[in-house]
Amino acid sequence: IYVILGPSGSGKSTMLNMLGGLDSLDSGSITVDGKEISKLKSGELTKYRRSDVGFVFQFYNLIPDLTVKENIQVVSDIAKEPLPLDEVMQAVDIGKYKDRFPNELSGGQQQRVAIARAIIKNPKLLLCDELTGALDSKTSKNVLKFVEKVNAQFGTTVAIITHNEMIAGMADGVIRIKDGKVVANKVNETKIPADKLEL
């Protein structure tokens, strides 16, 4: 788990979009899992995004007319090697809501559906933009615990973009961004579980 920190406008979301193959580079290169994604052609980038990357954005982008289960299945239906639906719903504790619609869920529950949708396709990389930005402290801890569980249970590398310094405590590595540049990249020697964070 990596936490990418920086003030608003520092380039965190741009970095996330470049890692996910959504934005292109002006200079330099990006290598993910031995693959230089900054040199991939459009079709290869689409394949990379579909197979290797899961996205969880600030706005969950759930489809309002689909149930929780259907929102997740939309992604699993196009995935090459999706994880079992029941296993993913259990991992993020949303199985009991599977027949509900997004407007019947709390913000934290919607966030868990978004996480489930991102991980069902079994991505190598899970990119989370301001994962807890609109959530209260208790819900934030629960969502971060689910991300830890996803990392441990499925072996997914996770990058969380945030301006909240406290989240860095749960990370294996912390990257700091300022004015579009990486100003620090450190291993976290004192990693603590998400439920012990003081948010």
Task: Walk through the language-model features, giving the residues of each.
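A short, proline-enriched helix->beta-strand linker immediately N-terminal to the Walker B motif
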Residues: 120-124
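Conserved ABC transporter NBD signature motif
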Residues: 28-36
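Helix-to-loop junction immediately C-terminal to a conserved catalytic motif
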Residues: 20
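Catalytic Walker B motif of ABC-type/P-loop ATPase nucleotide-binding domains
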Residues: 126-129
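Conserved ABC ATPase "signature" region
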Residues: 35-36, 73, 81-97
